[in-house]
Amino acid sequence: TPSLLGYIITSKYADGLPLYRLEQMFKRLGQEVSRTSMAHWIIRLDEVFQPLMNLLREEQNHATYLQADETRIQVLKEKGKTAQSDKWMWVTRGGPPGRPSVLFEYDPSRAGSVPVRLLDGFSGILQADGYSGYSQVCKESGLTRIGCWDHARRKFIEATQAAPSVAKGK
């Protein structure tokens, strides 16, 4: 049922419960719901939600300002990759005023081709960190790139911590 799928998705991604724990919880409630079935349902939902994701991405990319970042994630079983190899969750935030959206997209690569694909059709101001992977899309699409204040703040903190106490005014 849609409510069962909603519960499984929320439990796994918002609450961080692995599927084997959900399987155990359902078993205690007298229901046989295998983690294999749940995994297949989640994979199938990716296909179901793809048109919605495409629409949200298109709406985001018609805005004049976007934020983008990428972060490492661990994927335990992925064809051709070890669990220790870097994989990436890419996030973009933006959209029309009053209706911003935050989109997450997994990609095993951190190559510059990923933001080129994600930001296809965007022409505005991109706020991102200093990662060089955004340079290609900025150059090809004529984007104005601005820095991330949190990353700038971290550099000041690092400089303060590295400075001798005399330089800190103490």
Question: Model features per residue range: what roles?
Answer:
Residues 1-170:
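Catalytic center-proximal scaffold of phosphoryl-transfer enzymes
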